């Protein structure tokens, strides 16, 4: 089974503005057997809505619940936490970015993200897709 992990902004775009997804991102999502988000993404999305950095037509909780029906939520495990803090100092320092990237690594999934800082990080296997 193929699972792809959606970065927070990709989860929003997929649900509300799919035209913002690249062709490769759209194909990765379309061909996946399962879509997943890291638990920290729910906080990020709620925060972005509260700060009006994303626009929702319905209350934030209703939107999050609707989105959650279509994706698997993946929590922070000890191995994800250890991988996140072990990323080099050259990796972006934002804890959410580290946790999301580490989640993809630990599960062996591709991370769909537009974030150039994450996409430019070198890893032994391809991690990101955009």
From Swiss-Prot:
It comes from the Bacteria. Mg(2+) binds at residues 7, 97. It is found in: Secreted. Its main location: secreted. Its EC number is 3.1.-.-. One of its GO terms (molecular function) is RNA nuclease activity. Keywords: Hydrolase, Magnesium, Metal-binding, Nuclease, Secreted, Toxin-antitoxin system. It is an enzyme of class 3 (hydrolase). Pfam families: PIN. Gene3D superfamilies: 5'-nuclease. Toxic component of a type II toxin-antitoxin (TA) system. An RNase. Upon expression in M.smegmatis inhibits translation and colony formation. Its toxic effect on colony formation is neutralized by coexpression with cognate antitoxin VapB22; the effect on translation has not been tested but is probably neutralized also. This is Ribonuclease VapC22. It comes from Mycobacterium tuberculosis (strain ATCC 25618 / H37Rv). The lineage of its organism: Bacteria, Bacillati, Actinomycetota, Actinomycetes, Mycobacteriales. The gene is vapC22.
């Amino acid at each position: 089974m193929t699972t792809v992990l959606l970065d927070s902004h990709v989860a929003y775009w997929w649900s509300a503005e799919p035209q913002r997804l690249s062709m490769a991102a759209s194909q990765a999502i379309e061909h996946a057997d399962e879509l997943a988000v890291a638990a920290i993404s729910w906080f990020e999305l709620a925060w972005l809505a509260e700060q009006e950095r994303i626009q929702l037509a319905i209350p934030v909780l209703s939107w999050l619940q609707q989105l959650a029906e279509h994706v698997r939520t993946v929590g922070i495990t000890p191995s994800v936490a250890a991988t996140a803090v072990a990323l080099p100092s050259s990796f972006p320092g934002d804890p959410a970015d580290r946790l999301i990237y580490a989640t993809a690594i630990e599960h062996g999934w591709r991370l769909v993200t537009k974030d150039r800082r994450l996409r430019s990080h070198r890893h032994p296997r391809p991690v990101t897709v955009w």
